[in-house]
From Swiss-Prot:
Record's keyword annotation contains Nuclease: yes
UniProt function note: Toxic component of a possible type II toxin-antitoxin (TA) system. A putative RNase. Its cognate antitoxin is VapB34.
Gene name linked to the record: vapC34
Protein's name in the database: Putative ribonuclease VapC34
Binding, Mg(2+): 4
UniProtKB keywords: Hydrolase, Magnesium, Metal-binding, Nuclease, Toxin-antitoxin system
Amino acid sequence: MVIDTSALVAMLNDEPEAQRFEIAVAADHVWLMSTASYPEMATVIETRFGEPGGREPKVSGQPLLYKGDDFACIDIRAVLAG
């Protein structure tokens, strides 16, 4: 499946279609995005939430879902401990 920015934004904002999109994504084993979607996503996030929405994840108070040790020394709560 190729995932468009519009679907990602809908899921991130918990828009009415979000659950349908999340179910579709979970049911597929291949997730692709256009390279153009990455800067487009950043633009949409900054437009909707201002600069802190795209550059200061700590502002939201939400935990960070990540893989690896790249964020071990930051003061943002992890979704998955250890």
